[in-house]
């Protein structure tokens, strides 16, 4: 039972998220042989003020 965790910044549409989990499921199934119904994809969305790169919050990057 493959489990895929994806952390991403919030803001994508429901359609984009549906397409993402479908594509990830298909790729994992193709490359592992696991049936799609046994593949779990967990999406964790975070706000831009809860994520940083190089010590700079993503929310602060946009303010610059």
Curated annotation (Swiss-Prot):
<keyword id="KW-0413">Isomerase</keyword>
<dbReference type="GO" id="GO:0016853">
    <property type="term" value="F:isomerase activity"/>
</dbReference>
<feature type="active site" description="Proton acceptor; via imino nitrogen">
    <location>
        <position position="2"/>
    </location>
</feature>
<dbReference type="InterPro" id="IPR014347">
    <property type="entry name" value="Tautomerase/MIF_sf"/>
</dbReference>
<protein>
    <recommendedName>
        <fullName>Probable tautomerase lp_1712</fullName>
        <ecNumber>5.3.2.-</ecNumber>
    </recommendedName>
</protein>
<comment type="similarity">
    <text>Belongs to the 4-oxalocrotonate tautomerase family.</text>
</comment>
<dbReference type="InterPro" id="IPR018191">
    <property type="entry name" value="4-OT"/>
</dbReference>
<dbReference type="Pfam" id="PF01361">
    <property type="entry name" value="Tautomerase"/>
</dbReference>
<dbReference type="InterPro" id="IPR004370">
    <property type="entry name" value="4-OT-like_dom"/>
</dbReference>
